[in-house]
């Protein structure tokens, strides 16, 4: 792997964590968060929901199976990638490993370097995660080039994750259509940073997907594309910045259109319902998060990546469908009278367990009932 120079993670409270730099030689700012996922770093790094964030991995061994080729595809979308490029601002790990896997095309170090993303290894990530868990997520910078760290700290304290619209940075500028071999339905996806894993699950079920930009009128698109339903995707950032989007979603409620939301999509459906959103102290990010379905009484393990949640008492026309068994936060909602469902977690996983792929089947049943 060669000789790696020193690098630093600087936090808004003045803490400076020293490590060894890998990836690109640069400076990147972001909200510092962590994931407890043991595997799936290519999926995590390319997840658009991480835009604007520096990601810490609690699992100490990263890079063990390298980075696979994008030529491995399903429904025309590359496997093990959740978008076309790395979306995190930086990656902080404990050990940078030499890969040994048949599908590996390059090392983690090479991949980050190619995409201009800095990394830091040789860090006690579990101690760092304990700090964030106790004090909450905070702004920071990953520095892998020579610079004045005092100046970096000043810059950190000027940035605001809460007031930045990251969705517009990851949403497409024009519509994108994905067509399966046997089309049963057509769904308009309000693309706020949709994961490829979600698209793959929709396409597997015979759903033609029309991805539209975040600031388009969802109802107008639904009718112009002669769609059967609407899907509100995951995405990065503060949901309360997207109140105009929530208003447009609210208009679609009046048409009784089948709808489904995931992650940010659930939060926007709740905002459209007049509910309140709050920020979690350190978020839910990992692939082993327990969730309970209040209707069936069943529990399952899920993949999660969110920093905000719904205030359950503030829901009006929706009811709580699922809850997180760690902190009882809202993980799923259903409309009381309209064909609308949503989850806060990611039923497609990617990476993670497939315990809740059935949620997509529930959406298909709703579409079938309205056909």
From Swiss-Prot:
Pfam families: CPSase_sm_chain, GATase. L-glutamine binds at residues 49, 235, 237, 264, 267, 305, 307-308. Its EC number is 6.3.5.5. It catalyses: hydrogencarbonate + L-glutamine + 2 ATP + H2O = carbamoyl phosphate + L-glutamate + 2 ADP + phosphate + 2 H(+). Pathway: Amino-acid biosynthesis; L-arginine biosynthesis; carbamoyl phosphate from bicarbonate: step 1/1; Pyrimidine metabolism; UMP biosynthesis via de novo pathway; (S)-dihydroorotate from bicarbonate: step 1/3. Residues 1-182 are annotated as: CPSase. One of its GO terms (molecular function) is carbamoyl-phosphate synthase (glutamine-hydrolyzing) activity. This is Carbamoyl phosphate synthase small chain. One of its GO terms (biological process) is glutamine metabolic process. Residues 186-371 form the Glutamine amidotransferase type-1 domain. Composed of two chains; the small (or glutamine) chain promotes the hydrolysis of glutamine to ammonia, which is used by the large (or ammonia) chain to synthesize carbamoyl phosphate. Tetramer of heterodimers (alpha,beta)4. NCBIfam families: CPSaseIIsmall, PRK12838.1. PANTHER family: CARBAMOYL-PHOSPHATE SYNTHASE SMALL CHAIN, MULTIFUNCTIONAL TRYPTOPHAN BIOSYNTHESIS PROTEIN-RELATED. Keywords: Amino-acid biosynthesis, Arginine biosynthesis, ATP-binding, Glutamine amidotransferase, Ligase, Nucleotide-binding, Pyrimidine biosynthesis. Disulfide bonds: none annotated. The active site is at 263 (nucleophile), 346, 348. Coiled coil: none annotated. The keyword Ligase applies. Belongs to the CarA family. The lineage of its organism: Archaea, Methanobacteriati, Methanobacteriota, Thermococci, Thermococcales. Small subunit of the glutamine-dependent carbamoyl phosphate synthetase (CPSase). CPSase catalyzes the formation of carbamoyl phosphate from the ammonia moiety of glutamine, carbonate, and phosphate donated by ATP, constituting the first step of 2 biosynthetic pathways, one leading to arginine and/or urea and the other to pyrimidine nucleotides. The small subunit (glutamine amidotransferase) binds and cleaves glutamine to supply the large subunit with the substrate ammonia. It is an enzyme of class 6 (ligase). It comes from the Archaea. The keyword Nucleotide-binding applies.
